[in-house]
């Protein structure tokens, strides 16, 4: 048995460095790819990937299999099981990853976790039946609004260009144009940890952007539903919006990808929204504890 240290690597100029958050998982996947292992088992503090956080929804179900793409989306929008880099590497190198619990005793119970695989191992029939795979939430969001930005070519580039140069990741974007004033309000979200740098960058560029006021709100949360099944099914977003509206939960922003729909809501309504959507998409386990 080879024991190999993880969480470290070399920079482009051959200096030893650490890999940052999720570095151990990334190391494990990289080694598995290098030795062409059949599977990479990652032991962590949870026993698999669930349809959502079981602490919020006790009826959440553990998933037997998840596609790379779904796991990548779930990890990027708040699921804490694996970091995006390890999942992305597994997807690139086609390494099957199994998430297992460090606390399970294999001599007493059969080892059961979640297997992260390619679409070909899931099967079209299974993907058709399973519209939504999981629901994730992320409270580490900040909403920024710039009011009365001149409605002219290049105005948006003056906002997001400097943010990109500062390596600040922008997620949801909304632009509301007031035709009678020739100006627009631009709202977007950034990671909460990047809010201070975002404000500093925008204040330095105020003259170039031409906005009137900068407002921000950290009491927001992003809720995301993820599933490869939505590629072939209509009405996923409609179900989400209707379920939230019926419980009086207001949507502040929306973003979508091929297999994901995300909404921004008040932070205080996070747990309620997750529970409502988990039920709306039929994800509740039948044998609830």
Task: Annotate each predicted stretch with a short phrase.
Residues 1-289:
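C-terminal catalytic "cap/lid" subdomain
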């Amino acid at each position: 048995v080879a024991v190999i240290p993880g969480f470290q690597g070399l920079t482009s100029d051959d200096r030893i460095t650490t890999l940052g958050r999720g570095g151990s998982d990334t190391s494990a996947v990289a080694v598995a790819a290098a030795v062409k292992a059949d599977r990479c088992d990652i032991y962590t503090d949870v026993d698999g990937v669930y349809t959502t956080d079981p602490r919020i929804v006790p009826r959440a179900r553990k998933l037997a299999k998840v596609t790379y793409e779904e796991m990548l989306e779930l990890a990027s929008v708040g699921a804490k099981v694996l970091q995006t880099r390890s999942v992305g590497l597994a997807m690139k190198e086609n390494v099957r990853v199994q998430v297992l619990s460090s606390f399970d005793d294999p001599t007493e119970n059969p080892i059961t976790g979640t297997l992260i695989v390619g679409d070909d191992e899931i099967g079209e029939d299974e993907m058709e039946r399973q519209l939504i795979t999981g629901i994730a939430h992320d409270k580490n969001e900040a909403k920024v609004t710039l009011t009365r930005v001149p409605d002219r070519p290049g105005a948006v580039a003056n906002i997001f260009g400097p943010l990109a140069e500062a390596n600040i990741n922008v997620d949801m974007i909304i632009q509301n144009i007031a035709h009678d004033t020739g100006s627009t309000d631009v709202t977007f979200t950034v990671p909460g940890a990047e809010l201070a740098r975002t404000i500093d960058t925008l204040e330095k560029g105020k003259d170039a952007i031409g906005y009137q006021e900068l407002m921000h709100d950290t009491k927001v949360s992003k809720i995301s539903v993820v599933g490869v099944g939505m590629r072939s099914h209509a009405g996923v977003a409609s179900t989400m919006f209707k379920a939230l509206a019926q419980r009086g939960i207001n949507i502040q922003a929306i973003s979508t990808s091929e297999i994901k729909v995300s909404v921004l809501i008040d932070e205080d309504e996070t747990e309620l929204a997750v529970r409502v959507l988990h039920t709306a998409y039929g994800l509740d386990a039948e044998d609830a504890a």
